[in-house]
Amino acid sequence: GDAEYPKLSAILRGLGFSFTATHKAKHVERWTQGDVNLVFNREDGSFANRYYDLHGLSVCAYGLSVEEPSKMVTRANQLSYPVSYGDPNTDTHGLPAIMGPEGAQLYFVDPNEQSPHWDREFVGNDEAAQNSWIETIDHIAVTMDHEQSLQATLLHKALFNLNPTSPLNVLDPS
């Protein structure tokens, strides 16, 4: 993603995000707006780097706000979704995650915690926060094939107790 970095960072700034912190040990940046955190990972050999090699510039992980992540981990294990906690040599956040059907990591984040992993892993910078137009994210669209769509529907219904709606086809602007 280094080639796309200048364009992507300009787009993020144009959308109102601020580059607020740098990871203490890795080539990773934290961008924020309101309660939304975007992590831009350019670390060689990382999960994000491998995901980029397979999919190109894309989102490789999501932090999902769930009440009682420990219960979500238990439920994921009961449904045979393997839970990972990252590589203890490189990841210090300790957030549990499962792999989504399209290969992205789905992290379980407790909305009641102040997310101390941000303070533990990142050092703030002096970029001034911009006006916030986005406070939170409540919907995301993911491109996937039909089989992945069926797997995603099952995962979200079984694990998160979400009810599917009718599919929506969105044209690719490229």
Where in the sequence are the language-model features?
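Glyoxalase I/VOC metalloenzyme domain signal
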Residues: 1-24, 32-85, 92-168, 173-174
